[in-house]
Amino acid sequence: MEICLGKLCNNRCVFCMSSADRDAHRPWLPPEQVKGELDHFHREGSRSVGFLGGEPTVYPHLLECVAYARGLGYTRIAVCSNGARFSDMAYCRALVEAGATRVTASIHSHKPKVEDGLITKIPGNLAKKVAGLRNLLALAAEGELKDGVSLNPVLCRKTLSGMAGYLRYFSAIGIRDIRFNYIWPSGSVIDDPEWIPSYREAMPHIARILILNERRLGLRLSFGGVPRCAMRLAGLSPRLADHLAAKYLDESAFDPDNDVAAPPEEGALPRRFVWQEHKRDNLKLREESCRPCRHYESCDGVWKTYASLHGLGELEPV
């Protein structure tokens, strides 16, 4: 299960899906409610929790809540962060001592002019994030963070051509687990084609990255938000396209159903929902013509905001 602690953040990513709540300075979920959600889902049998934001590391009670989760018996405790706070090794040590076993960092580019200048709008941000990764990897080498350190970049037009360099740069640091998330048109770029490539444009780039990984890098690599039928747009043989799509694009395999507790929109209690169901039923679209596809049951289509910009004509039953 995952707990969204609130939407406040120390970055200003232009494509942030939470930008409206972030900029409205909506309050954090009180720690007693976070603990209540941990109690509830522990009783339901959950032993894995992820803390999300906003930016969890600026939540004043994160260490307290991580320690509470460990005390209850959660064995996998993850924090999904933009990574900047981890440049402070003392904070990193405090987090793992509290009980964190995994950290995922949202670093979108290895180039300062893109990461700092175009995306997060924070000068010097990338250098802090890279220093933070090195700190986390050093702790992992000491036997901490048993569930790993990973990256969670958004793939957009500004980063599309730099993916190979991104993989090489961060694999050289020691990262072995990367999940690219195809941009969900949101925030200030919700309808901006300068940021949101079509699958037809993106898939040849993605295919080259997958082949690079197969032949040379051997990373634990996956792509979210890319329907498997999009692989046919990459210009590959059907057999190779099927192999790569099954290995790298199957969200049902690497993104199983998970419960989410989030700050309330109205009222005093956190909202609870299953993210995959909410995403499929409220945020994404499929064509009626998709029904014959052999992947129909495991595919949730494309973001509605993507369809508003690029349509649904790229979808085709496999």
Predicted features and spans:
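Radical SAM/AdoMet-radical enzyme domain recognition
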Residues: P31-G50, Y59-I183
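Canonical Radical SAM [4Fe-4S] cluster-binding loop centered on the CxxxCxxC motif
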Residues: M1-E32
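A short acidic, helix-capping loop that chelates divalent metal ions and anchors anionic groups
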Residues: R22-A24, P112-I119, G187-D192
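Flexible mid-to-C-terminal extensions adjoining Fe-S/redox cofactors in radical SAM and related proteins
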Residues: G235, Y248-V318
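A structural motif corresponding to the C-terminal lobe/cap of the Radical SAM core domain
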Residues: D191-L217, A246-D250, D255-P264, E316-V318
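Structural recognition of alpha->loop->beta junctions
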Residues: C92-H108, R168-D177, H243-F273, N282
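Flexible glycine/acidic-rich beta-alpha junction loops that bind and position SAM and/or redox cofactors
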Residues: D177-Y199, R220-D242, P256-L269
